[in-house]
Amino acid sequence: MYRGSMVALVTPMKADGSLDWDALHKLIDWHLEQGTHAIVAVGTTGESATLNMAEHLEVISKVVDQVNGRVPVIAGTGANSTSEALELTQGAKQAKADACLLVTPYYNKPSQEGLYQHYCYLAREVAIPQFLYNVPGRTAVDMLPETVARLATVENIVGIKDATASMERLQQMQALTDDSFIFLSGDDATSVDFMALGGHGEISVTANVVPAQTAKICELALAGNVEQARELDRPLAPLHEALFLEANPVPVKWAMARMGFLDGALRLPLTPLNAVYHAQLEAAMLSAGAI
């Protein structure tokens, strides 16, 4: 169920900062037409950090309603407060999301035991499939393989999104968990290698821009056709890089605006992509066949 290309969906906004529901609905339908295997709503790319609680839950609800069971919906419900993560996760279950994605608590830098207790509490309190999410470059905390292994035995915890871009880390976690635990890449540039080593798919920023290509790459890699997947991925390499010229989702929103899907608005403290990067990102989009 949780395999392949899972788009880390942007949250469209209008110039006044309000949420653009029409653009959101059109994006979802486009992704389903293009073959995206799952929708991840209100994660990092979906600007969860600048949505209030009501908006966060409303986006989840509207995504679930628009998808209407056609593919799985994974709701981002992580927070650096366990009580807030609980409220979001409960709301996602009520909205009938298929699963939740919970980033490690950021800024307050919990210990490994703190991480373990945080996730155990959420898994115990809300009966919905839950994915751990380790992205130390953003959170200032790294969930170690031994902690992942402890959590992999907890009911309702089904897998992890790993954004370390380390194949060694993937293999360490695989060695400590059983075959039922799901590994999803959180790094587009290394996702083919990740799947070649037994990963189950990726939660992709690049899929916002080239969903059909990303889905096909995942299908090939998961079928064991790794060299074909690499060949198809090669023209996307400049795009993988360019989408992080500034903090995600600043570049991807510029790209989506360039494609005509939304106006590219962001909420402070994020600001539009610096003009010095426009040509590089546009060239990467051309290389990838996005425009």
Curated annotation (Swiss-Prot):
Catalyses which reaction(s): L-aspartate 4-semialdehyde + pyruvate = (2S,4S)-4-hydroxy-2,3,4,5-tetrahydrodipicolinate + H2O + H(+)
SUPFAM superfamilies: Aldolase
EC annotation from Swiss-Prot or TrEMBL: 4.3.3.7
Localization (cell): Cytoplasm
Classification via PROSITE patterns: DHDPS_1, DHDPS_2
PANTHER family: 4-HYDROXY-2-OXOGLUTARATE ALDOLASE, MITOCHONDRIAL, DIHYDRODIPICOLINATE SYNTHASE
Family: Belongs to the DapA family.
Name of the protein this chain belongs to: 4-hydroxy-tetrahydrodipicolinate synthase
Organism the protein comes from: Teredinibacter turnerae (strain ATCC 39867 / T7901)
Gene name linked to the record: dapA
